């Protein structure tokens, strides 16, 4: 099959229409090339900004409508006011930054997938054939666990957690296969799955809460395996979900500024992270002032501002509860 042969299904066309009803520019789905890997994986499509327009580019034609719908639903969640992740900090090591961004985005996406997969199942976009292709995608991504375990436990746990979200309950045969091939990482993934499914995602607020929970629990698991933690609560900025009352609070009432060891990506100066006092999650990043402006007054002024004024100053998006 070639890209020109792909026909958009009515369900996917419906999603394209829904997205275009909200988005001020134009959103189009574009199928590219003729590659068919023989499995589905979430890296087979991407969103590309083209001026005011967004292109959903599907680069693998194994299951083009499923893959397009997945990406469209991610976009629909953002346009509907669900929190996003931002990466404003640098460790000074480009390779490490890249790894941390990939992992942080993956954890965030897994919580997204709780909603995305539910919507796909509602619209019959996940068939037994798609489930089979998804399982093949898991097997193409992670090898069975060796004894002793290797350095791919993080990837296995992420992949299996996402698979548990995708398959949901009632796939005993697949679970048995996972138990046989990945016993240690599956046990970890099941604990994390129970955590993010304990309370349903019913709003941007509950979505954000589950992302923060997963960031923290994933680090606890890595530390239990004596692996380096990802520190997404500091490295990854997550959109704040605030009430009107909270917007009028002083910054000091809702956030605590913390002098980070990392630097602001834009200015390359030491960074201050604004942590939400309720859950210790990075809500915004400030660049340290220039030496000439580095006075106690500088920080007092920031703490004295209202939350709304600070977000305006930083051009930081927020979501109203």
Predicted regions span which residues?
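Post-HEXXH active-site segment of zinc metalloproteases
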Residues: 63, 77-112, 211
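Active-site His/Glu-centered metal-binding helix of metallohydrolases
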Residues: 68-77
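Pan-zinc metallopeptidase signature
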Residues: 138-296
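Hydrophobic, glycine-enriched assembly/anchoring segments
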Residues: 293-321
């Amino acid at each position: 099959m070639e890209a020109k042969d792909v026909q958009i299904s009515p369900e996917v066309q419906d999603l394209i229409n829904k997205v275009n009803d909200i988005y001020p520019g134009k959103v189009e789905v574009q199928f590219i090339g003729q590659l068919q890997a023989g499995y589905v994986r979430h890296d087979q499509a991407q969103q590309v900004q083209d001026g005011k327009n967004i292109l959903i580019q599907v680069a693998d034609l194994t299951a083009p409508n499923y893959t397009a719908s997945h990406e469209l639903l991610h976009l629909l969640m953002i346009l509907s006011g669900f929190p996003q992740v931002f990466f404003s900090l640098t460790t000074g090591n480009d390779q490490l930054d890249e790894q941390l961004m990939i992992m942080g985005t993956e954890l965030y996406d897994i919580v997204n997938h709780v909603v995305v997969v539910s919507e796909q199942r509602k619209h019959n976009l996940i068939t037994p054939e798609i489930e089979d292709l998804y399982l093949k995608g898991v097997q193409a991504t992670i090898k069975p666990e060796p004894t002793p375990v290797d350095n791919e436990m993080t990837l296995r746990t992420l992949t299996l957690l996402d698979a548990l979200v995708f398959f949901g309950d009632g796939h005993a045969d697949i679970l048995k296969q996972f138990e046989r091939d990945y016993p240690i990482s599956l046990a970890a993934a099941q604990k994390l799955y129970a955590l993010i499914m304990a309370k349903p995602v019913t709003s941007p607020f509950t979505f954000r809460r589950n992302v923060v929970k997963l960031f923290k629990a994933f680090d606890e698991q890595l530390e239990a395996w004596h692996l380096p933690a990802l520190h997404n609560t500091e490295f990854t900025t997550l959109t704040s979900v605030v009430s009107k009352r909270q917007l009028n609070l002083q910054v000091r009432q809702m956030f605590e500024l913390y002098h980070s060891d990392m630097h602001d990506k834009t200015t390359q100066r030491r960074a201050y992270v604004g942590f939400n006092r309720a859950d210790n999650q990075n809500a915004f990043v400030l660049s340290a002032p220039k030496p000439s402006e580095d006075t106690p007054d500088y920080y007092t002024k920031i703490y004295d501002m209202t939350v709304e004024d600070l977000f305006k100053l930083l051009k930081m998006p927020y979501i109203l509860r």
